[in-house]
Amino acid sequence: MRLKALFFLAWLITSLPTAAQLSRAQFSSLENILGEKSSFSGHMTGFILYDLDSQKVVYEKNSQLNFIPASTTKLFTLFAAVAILQDSTQTLRYVASGDTLKIWGAGDPSWKYQDFFQPDFEKVWKNYQVIQYSDANQVSPAFGYGWQWDDYYYDYSAERSPLPIYGNLLEVKKVGNRPEVFPSRFQKSISTTTLPIKELERDLHTNDFKYSPTTFLGRERFIPLLTSGQLTAELAQELTGKTWIYKKESLPENNQAFRGAPVFPLLQEMMLESDNFIAEQMLWMVSDHLFQTLDTERAIEYIQKTYFFDLPDQPKWVDGSGLSRHNLFTPRSMVVLIDKLYRIVPEDQLYALLPTGGKTGTLKNTFQAAQPYIFAKSGSMSNHYSLAGLVRTKSGKTYAFAFMNSNFLGRPSAIRAEVEKVMALVREVL
C-alpha cells in the first residue's frame, strides 16, 4: 500500500485555478454542453475533471455541492477494503471450550454465495462435532441506516449478518405451475393466496411466503431472507453435518481470527456488478479487523479520520453500498478519492475492478468505442445518477472525473445518455 503522500490533494482541489490547462476552444466546448441551454439545466449537476499527472483541476462545475452518490459510494468502500483487509476476508473468530468450538462471524459474505472461492472451514472445526454460534459481536442492524423498508423484498437489499450463508437469499424457480425454492427447508413455508400477485412474495416480518396459482409467472429470482442467529445455526448444521447451537455470548479477548477467501474476486463482483450485499459485508469485515465488532458506523468513522481527513468536503457516508439516501458526497471529494485509489491500487488491479465502458460490468452496454475510454463506477436511483472514475482521452492522457446529477425528473437512463455525450466530448477535445 502506498498510502503516504496522499494528503495534500484537498489543498490542490480547492486552491488551483479552474480550467488552467484548457484552451479557449476546449473550455467553450465543455461550457456549451454543460451550460444553461444544455440537457443539464433543469436539475442539479456537478462535474469535475482532474489531471492525475499535474494534479490540477482542468474543469469544474458545481463541484463543491453535495449529491446523493447512490452506488458510487462503493468507491469509498473499495478504498476501505483495500487499505484494511488487503488480500483476504475476515471470516470467523473462535475459541475452543472443551469439545465445543465457539465461533462468531466476522462478516465474510462468500459461504455458498454464487461461485466464490470457499473458506476452508474444516481447518477450524474439523476436530469438533459441536459448534456454538453467537452473533453478540453484531452492533449494526441487518438493515442499513436510511434504507427503504419496502425494499426488503428485492435481492439488491439483502440483509447484513455476521456469518451469511447463500448470500442471505432464497432462490426461486418455477416447476410446473408452482414455485420451488432453495434452500428447500423453506418449501414448507409457502402457501397460496387469492391475491393476484405475479411472483412469490415474502411476509415482511417472517420467512413465510405466498403465491397465486392463477397469476404466478415464476421468473427465476432471489428473495432476501429474514436473518437471525438461530437460522444461521440451522443452515450451517445442514451444510456441515455437525451439531450447531445458537447461544448469544460475548466475544472473549483470547479469540483467534480465521481469514478465509481471497478478497479480490469479491471486490470485483462488488464493483463490476454493483453487488450491494458484498459492499455492506465489506465494511463489516473492516470493522471486525479493526475492532472485533460488526459496526458500520464505527468503521466509517475510522476510515474517514485516518484516510479521508484531507478531503475538500467531509462526506456524509452512512453505508457500504449506497442504498441509503442519507449519503452525501461532493464531486471534488470524489476525484480526490479516485486519485487515492489510482496511487495505492496496482494499475492492472484497478482497471480490473472498475467497470469498463462497452466491455465489463454495469458499463458493458454504454460508452462503447473501439478503444475503451471510460473506467468508472456508476450509481443510480430514482432522480439521481452519478459516474466517477477515470477517462482516457485521444491524446493519451488519463483524468479522474466525477459527474453527479440529482433531482431530475424522468428515468436515469436519459441522464446517463447525456453524460455519455459529455464524456465522449472530453475524450475528443482533451
Give each language-model segment a name.
Residues M1-Q26:
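Bacterial Sec-dependent N-terminal signal peptides
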Residues D53-Q55, L65-I68, G107-W111, N137-S140, ...:
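Solvent-exposed loop/turn segments at secondary-structure junctions
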Residues V58-E60, F258, L283-L430:
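Small-residue-rich helix-loop
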Residues A83-D313, V429:
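Conserved serine DD-peptidase/penicillin-binding transpeptidase domain
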Residues F47-L49, R93-V95, A388:
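Short beta-strand scaffold segments in enzyme catalytic cores
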Residues Q21-D53, V57-N66, L85-S88, V124-Q129:
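Beta-lactamase-like hydrolase cores
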